[in-house]
């Protein structure tokens, strides 16, 4: 029975003396005498959130976008924090007669990962950690790797966008992209649960913002690179460089071994940067791992022959459509091989892999294919629609674009949808603080300017948009609801209402199937 302590922390932490931590990260005592001795207290946890503090914690008071964490130091201390780490601006905001030791560092976030790793006894060194980065395919590849590990008898942990899993059990958590202290605590909890191998998604944000600092990666995997997160990264080059931190020989985050898909130019550049990468290709590139003889498998699945670095052939199959998922599977197989799991050991697990909200089929007995997918950027949308487009059937796509995210991808997504689908229903995604109608207009402009013959309509209400596409579909057609995947809420302004594309699509299908059967 898998259990995880409250707060996704280990239940037993020996602790580290505060003077040793200060020496390790180059912090000094705040106050007029920077050479003052650091009090000899024991730290047993680290957190950024005052409300998460447990007795014995060090509270990291960091500068934020709108406020400074030091404003919450008093609450943290009241909850049992034995020390505070902050910068000069934070020290200036601390109130009261400060009896709790306060460490000063000019860039506290930059040392937080290593500090937390030390407090939790360097958990990644007690585990085999596999990190997967790339624009698309991270979630699918982590699930494939987890399935392969478990098929080989390994006790696996998974950390990613959809959630956290330990030995196949879902662990409730809001930690989609854990900050460094939460990640180190989680890894320590997994080690305590006797997990031996952890596979985790590693986003560009996590790499650039230090969220994986202190983590030692046994293997790093790269899937692909296309436009995304340009609201955070100023250029695609900057985006690439963030991903490269997992592979560059000069990076402190560099994985011990690298697996890189070279089916796009960024992958080939990443392999060259890594220097000694194991390469994979599903597109005929000369690579260590290749896929050939790809053929359909059942409804929506694929089977293919894998050629390994020694030239040995293996049969593999996945219950996931789309040629890009063949590439994801190759990355997974190469990563598994790097940690001692053979294709034959992994194959049964790969064949059973289901990924929440990733090309997830919704079947209510209808006579057409209905899918939900997380594709929310131009490259991913193109890959998904291309995999579904066939001359013998019509294709409908329902999608929108997130507010307060890279606006430059909206028109290209509209153009891509109009090029590849027969019906394009532009709707709301997560508008957040933006005007939903304005977001839709940008998508519609791209679709209109593409000059394609698709029928393009606008239905802002996502529930109604899904029902329109379902009503449109006929026997053998395909309906894809894209953009939100596994998400269970829709955010407008500051309010998030319950909304799950999978639930809504299933309800729409059930409503439609009854009348159709009656007519039949």
UniProtKB/Swiss-Prot annotation:
The UniProt record lists the keyword Ligase: yes
Domain of life: Bacteria
SUPFAM superfamilies per UniProt: MurD-like peptide ligases, catalytic domain (SSF53623), MurD-like peptide ligases, peptide-binding domain (SSF53244), MurE/MurF N-terminal domain (SSF63418)
Compartmental location: Cytoplasm
Record-listed UDP-N-acetyl-alpha-D-muramoyl-L-alanyl-D-glutamate binding positions: 48, 176-177, 203, 211
Catalysis performed (reactions): UDP-N-acetyl-alpha-D-muramoyl-L-alanyl-D-glutamate + meso-2,6-diaminopimelate + ATP = UDP-N-acetyl-alpha-D-muramoyl-L-alanyl-gamma-D-glutamyl-meso-2,6-diaminopimelate + ADP + phosphate + H(+)
Cleaved signal peptide residues: none
Residue numbers of N6-carboxylysine PTMs: 243
EC nos: 6.3.2.13
GO annotation, cellular component aspect: cytoplasm
Example GO molecular function: magnesium ion binding
Keyword line: ATP-binding, Cell cycle, Cell division, Cell shape, Cell wall biogenesis/degradation, Cytoplasm, Ligase, Magnesium, Nucleotide-binding, Peptidoglycan synthesis
Enzyme class: ligase
S-S pairs: none
The keyword Nucleotide-binding is annotated on this UniProt entry: yes
Post-translational modification, as annotated: Carboxylation is probably crucial for Mg(2+) binding and, consequently, for the gamma-phosphate positioning of ATP.
An example Gene Ontology biological process: peptidoglycan biosynthetic process
Motif interval(s): Meso-diaminopimelate recognition motif: 429-432
Bilayer-spanning residue ranges: none
Binding residues for ATP: 134-140
NCBIfam families registered for this protein in UniProt: murE, PRK00139.1-2, PRK00139.1-4
Family: Belongs to the MurCDEF family. MurE subfamily.
Role of this protein: Catalyzes the addition of meso-diaminopimelic acid to the nucleotide precursor UDP-N-acetylmuramoyl-L-alanyl-D-glutamate (UMAG) in the biosynthesis of bacterial cell-wall peptidoglycan.
Official protein name in the record: UDP-N-acetylmuramoyl-L-alanyl-D-glutamate--2,6-diaminopimelate ligase
Organism this protein belongs to: Mycobacterium avium (strain 104)
């Amino acid at each position: 029975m898998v259990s995880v302590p409250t707060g996704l922390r280990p239940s037993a932490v020996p602790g580290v003396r505060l003077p040793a931590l200060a020496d390790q990260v180059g912090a000094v005592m705040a106050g007029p005498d920077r050479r003052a001795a650091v009090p000899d207290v024991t730290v047993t946890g680290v957190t950024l959130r005052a409300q998460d503090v447990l007795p014995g914690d060090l509270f990291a008071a960091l500068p934020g976008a709108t406020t400074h964490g030091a404003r919450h130091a008093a609450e943290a201390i009241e909850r049992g924090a034995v020390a505070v780490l902050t910068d000069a601006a934070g020290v200036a905001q601390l109130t009261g007669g400060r009896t709790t030791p306060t460490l000063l560092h000019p860039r506290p976030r930059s040392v937080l990962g290593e500090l937390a790793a030390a407090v939790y006894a360097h958990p990644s060194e007690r585990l085999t950690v596999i990190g997967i980065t790339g624009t698309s395919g991270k979630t699918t590849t982590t699930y494939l790797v987890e399935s392969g590990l478990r098929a080989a008898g390994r006790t696996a942990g998974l950390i990613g966008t959809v959630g956290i899993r330990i030995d196949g059990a879902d662990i409730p958590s809001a930690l989609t992209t854990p900050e460094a202290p939460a990640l180190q605590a989680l890894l320590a909890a997994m080690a305590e649960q006797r997990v031996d191998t952890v596979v985790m998604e590693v986003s560009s944000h996590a790499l650039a913002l230090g969220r994986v600092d202190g983590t030692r990666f046994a293997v790093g995997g790269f899937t692909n690179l296309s436009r995304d997160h340009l609201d955070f990264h100023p250029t695609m080059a900057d985006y690439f460089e963030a991903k490269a931190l997992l592979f560059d020989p000069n990076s402190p985050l560099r994985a011990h071994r690298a697996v890189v898909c070279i089916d796009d130019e960024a992958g080939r550049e990443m392999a060259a940067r890594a220097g000694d990468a194991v390469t994979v290709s599903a597109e005929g590139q000369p690579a260590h791992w290749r896929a050939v003889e790809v053929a359909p498998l059942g409804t929506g699945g694929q089977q293919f022959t894998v050629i390994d670095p020694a030239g040995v052939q293996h049969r593999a199959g996945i219950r996931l459509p789309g040629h890009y998922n063949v590439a994801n599977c190759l990355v997974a197989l190469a990563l598994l091989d790097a940690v001692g799991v053979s294709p034959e050991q992994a194959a049964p697990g790969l064949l059973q892999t289901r990924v929440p909200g990733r090309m997830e089929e919704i079947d209510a007995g209808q006579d057409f294919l209905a899918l939900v997918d997380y594709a929310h950027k131009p490259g991913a949308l193109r890959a998904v629609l291309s995999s579904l487009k066939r001359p013998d059937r019509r294709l409908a796509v329902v999608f929108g674009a997130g507010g307060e995210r890279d606006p430059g991808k909206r028109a290209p997504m509209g153009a891509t949808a109009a090029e590849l689908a027969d019906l394009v229903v532009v709707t709301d995604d997560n508008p957040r603080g933006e005007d939903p109608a304005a977001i839709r207009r940008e998508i519609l402009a791209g679709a209109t300017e593409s000059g394609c013959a698709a029928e393009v309509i606008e239905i802002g209400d996502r529930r109604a948009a899904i029902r329109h596409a379902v009503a449109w579909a006929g026997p053998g057609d395909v309906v894809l609801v894209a953009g939100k995947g596994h998400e269970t809420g829709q955010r407008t302004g500051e309010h998030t209402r319950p909304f799950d594309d999978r639930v809504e699509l299933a309800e729409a299908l059930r409503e439609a199937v009854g009348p159709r059967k009656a007519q039949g």
